[in-house]
Design a protein with these regions (language model features):
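Structured segments of extracytoplasmic/periplasmic soluble domains
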Residues: 22-33, 90-97
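Solvent-exposed loop/turn segments at secondary-structure junctions
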Residues: 1, 12-15, 33-34, 44-48, ...
Length: 97
């Protein structure tokens, strides 16, 4: 069963890569007990590729858990505030650095 969090970004967007990296780092810090599946570069033929490639700003698809994994879903449901803070920290770090 798939487990962990991952961040998908446009493979030709340096700013998207940086944003995905900052988000991944904030999630790894906030949830050390969860598995990081890392960053995934998308192209136009990948599922989600159109979304991250057709925007006019850096875009990242954040997947904190797999919907098919009830244990991970329940974990993040019980830690919504920490989840929101991890998103905010990652975005803030991207904006100021």
């Amino acid at each position: 069963m798939a487990t962990g969090f991952e961040f998908l970004y446009c493979g030709v967007s340096p700013k998207g890569l940086t944003l995905a990296s900052k988000l991944s780092a904030s999630f790894a810090k906030a949830f050390p007990e969860q598995k990081s599946r890392g960053l995934k570069a998308l192209n136009k033929n990948d599922r989600g590729g159109t979304f991250v490639m057709k925007t006019h700003c850096p875009a990242v698809i954040c997947e904190p858990f797999f919907g098919s994994n009830r244990k991970d879903s329940d974990f993040f449901s019980a830690h919504r505030e920490e989840l929101a803070k991890a998103y905010a920290e990652g975005i803030l770090n991207w904006l100021v650095n």
